[in-house]
Amino acid sequence: MHLLDTLTEGLKEIDARGLRRRRRTADTPCAAHMTVDGRAIIGFASNDYLGLAAHPQLIAAIAEGAQRYGAGSGGSHLLGGHSRAHAQLEDDLAEFAGGFVDNARALYFSTGYMANLATLTALAGRGTTLFSDALNHASLIDGARLSRADVQIYPHCDTEALSAMLEASDADVKVIVSDTVFSMDGDIAPLPRLLELAEQHGAWLIVDDAHGFGVLGPQGRGAIAQAALRSPNLISIGTLGKAAGVSGAFVTAHETVIEWLVQRARPYIFTTASVPAAAHAVSASLRIIGGEEGDARRAHLQQLIERTRAMLKATPWLPVDSHTAVQPLIIGANDATLDIAATLDRAGLWVPAIRPPTVPTGTSRLRISLSAAHSQADLDRLEAGLQQLGAKAA
């Protein structure tokens, strides 16, 4: 069989199982109201939790950064590509998100995927046992695999099982890895207990706060700040293309950890540094997130979350008990989930259908992502659409 034939057969199998993914093309900036594939829609698909992606101040900051630093970085961070914008952002991030450890330092990455791979592969290896939550993000899973550590998966948020696994381990180095907010369920990891176990067993606790940074905690400083945790065992990873509205990611930890990443993290060392203008814009975003406007946006978002929770409970399907901006509604079968998403789309509502392998088989769902850019009228539209579909399904 020709190589292309093998791929064609594989794609047919994906189609037969209702699992083909398709990209959609946005013709306008990321916002609550967009033009996608030439049609006006209300979007419930993005991770723009604070509605900052099209904020005029950030657009201006991107332009200012490009004028000041140019279109590209020109090299890796260690070979000419580390600009003043990158350095300033790392200082800003350490101050904003590093309150959980003394002598905090931050390291800026081009993507959250790279930050997760870099951290796990630099800190874990042969002789390390890595304890990973069963529902961790794909980038954490891949980082664990690439680290060559012994990887043990503990049941989702089950700290009793994790405790037993730690007790049974004689590894030289132990690393606990977890999302803070789980991206497909919206629930929050038991961070205080995870840190307690990490300190009890002399382990690192690495948390991916991709969906918590900017939204949770005082001034949006993240899930660790919300839980009021402090420890040199903690390492926090956050993304800057979600609530922050721009792009990139960062790791915050004790300065010694960050210096180790600079020296040993291959995804940091062997890649061109991100566009300096983006770093300049993220610094502007942090000022919004941590200020009065950020507080107001989070308060509005919380109102939307509470209303959506009540709305989903009134449907014939299974809502996940999420108190975050990620509001899943489990439908079950792939085809049924796709049909509901398509019906909502025809009504001008973009609510993505999430299917295996992203979520377990039999738990295909609508993933409703809320943003401070949404209005109550937007939720009126969503509620009406779900009510009509629910009446047909009942």
UniProtKB/Swiss-Prot annotation:
GO terms for MF: 8-amino-7-oxononanoate synthase activity; pyridoxal phosphate binding
UniProt keyword list: Biotin biosynthesis, Pyridoxal phosphate, Transferase
Pathway: Cofactor biosynthesis; biotin biosynthesis
Documented EC number(s): 2.3.1.47
GO biological process, one term: biotin biosynthetic process
SUPFAM superfamilies: PLP-dependent transferases (SSF53383)
Cofactor: pyridoxal 5'-phosphate
Coiled coil: none
Stretches that traverse the bilayer: none
Binding site for substrate: R21, H137, T358
Annotated positions binding pyridoxal 5'-phosphate: G112, Y113, S183, H211, T239
Catalytic activity: 6-carboxyhexanoyl-[ACP] + L-alanine + H(+) = (8S)-8-amino-7-oxononanoate + holo-[ACP] + CO2
Function: Catalyzes the decarboxylative condensation of pimeloyl-[acyl-carrier protein] and L-alanine to produce 8-amino-7-oxononanoate (AON), [acyl-carrier protein], and carbon dioxide.
Quaternary structure (record): Homodimer.
PANTHER family with a match to the protein in the record: 8-AMINO-7-OXONONANOATE SYNTHASE (PTHR13693:SF100), CLASS II AMINOTRANSFERASE/8-AMINO-7-OXONONANOATE SYNTHASE (PTHR13693)
Protein name from the UniProt record: 8-amino-7-oxononanoate synthase
Species in which this protein is naturally found: Paraburkholderia phytofirmans (strain DSM 17436 / LMG 22146 / PsJN) (Burkholderia phytofirmans)
